[in-house]
UniProtKB/Swiss-Prot annotation:
It comes from Nostoc sp. (strain PCC 7120 / SAG 25.82 / UTEX 2576). It holds the Pfam family PBS_linker_poly. This is Phycobilisome rod-core linker polypeptide CpcG2. InterPro entries: PBS_linker_dom, PBS_linker_sf, Phycobilisome. GO terms for biological process: photosynthesis. Its main location: membrane. Residues 223-247 are annotated as: Disordered.
Amino acid sequence: MSIPLLEYKPSSQNQRVPGYEVPNEDTPRIYRIEDAAYDSELKELIWATYRQVFSEHVILKFFRQGNLESQLKNRAISVRDFVRGLAKSEAFKTLVIKSNSNYRLVELALKRLLGRAPYNKDEEIAWSIKIATNGWDGFVDALLDSEEYQSNFGENIVPYQRRRYKDRPFNLVTPRYGNYWRDKLESERYIEGDIKNFLELAKSIEIKTVTFTPVSTANIKIPDTTRNTTPTGIPISVNPSANFPVR
C-alpha cells in the first residue's frame, strides 16, 4: 500500500490568479495538436515537447524517441501521452534522473510538466516521498493524471511555463544538474597543470634496477666469411657503361 500524498499549502504564485497582461514577445507560444495541420507544424510541436521536457536546445538523435514520434504523427497517442513517454524514457533517466536528488527531481518535474515552480519545501517533501514509494514512473503518472495538469493543458497542449512575468525562463535558471553533481564531476575530472597530479604520477613510477650481464669476447664466435672458390669472368660494375679488368 503506497503512502498517500502529504498535505501542503500552496503559496501565492502568478499562475494561481487570473492575468490581464497584454501579449508580447515574452508570452509563451501554445502548441496544440489541433493546430498542426501540416507536417512542418507537427514537427515544431514535437520539437517544442522535447524542449519542454528535456529543457535542452539541442537533442541528439540517440535520445530521440522515434516510436513515440511516429504514434503522435499518426494520432495514435495524445500530446499528454507523448509527454508521459518522454519523461519515462531511458534518455530522460540518463540525462536528468541519475544526476539529481529526489528533491531536485521534484523541482524539475513541476517546472517542466506542470509549468510552475514548487510552492514550498513541504510540497517538495511530499512529492519526494511519492518518488521513494512509487518510483519515478509512478510520480510522472501522478503529475500528468492530476487535475492541475488536465485543467491547464488537457490532452493535446504541450506544457509551458504559465504566466511568466518578469522572471527568467525556467530552462535558464534551472540547469540539468545541481551543485552536488557538478562538484562530483569536477572532483573526478583530470585537472591539467595541477601539481598534485604530477606528485601522484611521480609516486606511482616504479624504478627498476638495471643489471649488467658480463660478456667475455673469447666466447664470441666470429663467422667465417672467406670464399673457397675464385671468381671467374669479368666483373661488371654497377654502372653498365664501365667495367674493370680482373687481375
